[in-house]
Amino acid sequence: MSSSPSPGAAKSPYVRRALRGAVACALIASIAIAACLIWGGPKPLPPLRSIGDPFKDVRFDGMPALRFFTARDGTQLAYRRYDTADMGHGKGSVMLVHGSSANSNSVHPLAQSFLEAGYTVYAFDIRGHGKSGVKGQVSYLGQLDDDLEDFVNAVQPARPRTLLGFSSGGGFALRVAGSPRGVQFDYFLFMAPYIHYKAMTNRSGASSAWAAMGIPRLVSLILLNRVGVRNFNDLPVLNFAVTESPKADLVRQYSYALALSFQPPDDYRTVIRSISRPAEVIAGGEDELFFADKYRPLLDEAGRSDIPVTIVPETGHINLTLSSAGRAAAVAAIQRLDNRFDHRN
């Protein structure tokens, strides 16, 4: 008398087939991700003159020497302090965050304008730029947030404190403003801030002339980070259209970790809604990288009609921080914030 096969035995060929299919899919996915990591990086770009040329006529007279503070990982990070015996006292402090690939030199004219208006000014070499750490690199996602907190704790800038960011630095300032760490500051000023590549303010064609993104590598790293694999976060995902001038000391590439740390998260609308301190936005009417007239509807869409937007006419992206009109608009914005909210008590 023959025995019939057990249900488990009958199903075993299907189980084995499913397992083989799963292994094959995993192998194919692994090969695809590996290929994207190796060959899916950003392409090189020729220098973008509209970004580099405005600095040719900038004078750096009176730029203070670099100082350093120690971050929690022991790294010495650079900044400049603008302060004299008869200026820069009594009105609080302004902390300047430069744009992508740049350093504290790039905001020198803006720093001078705030010093002349009576503020103590701090200009950062954000980690991964200038003389702060390894160019184009941070050690982990979110390290820039930790660095800023370490700076405030170490230096104790005078209150009221304003965090001002320009371009990518404006996106970083926005990131801080909408986080629990925003309470370290009294005001925020975002100058032509980079919000997100999907934001309505982004000129996709113009922005791609300045920064080339390695999409295949970026997507692969996002997927790997979702499953806890962070071993490859030091790979470059952005190339910038910078000049080769040693004097400029610019950063050509950003790693995945730095690129994501120096901008708002994907849910930027929630970040905007979460800003708990007074803030303003300034943009140049002729900005080549971002749509200046879209900042107002973007803020309104996020429910922040209370955040004013100032458009400086006939002013491009870089010239917003270099021209007398752009610098005057920035000083006026912080003076307005001072008049509306008194944090000196």
Residues covered by each model-derived region:
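Short beta-strand/loop motif that positions the catalytic acidic residue
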Residues: I275, V281-A283
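Catalytic nucleophile-loop/oxyanion-hole region of alpha/beta-hydrolase
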Residues: N103-S104, H129-V155, P160
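An N-terminal hydrophobic leader/cap segment in hydrolases
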Residues: P5-A71, T75-D83
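The serine-hydrolase catalytic nucleophile loop
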Residues: S100-Q112, D293
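Short alpha-helix in the alpha/beta-hydrolase fold that links the catalytic acid
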Residues: Y268, R277, E288-D300
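Conserved alpha/beta-hydrolase
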Residues: A111-G133
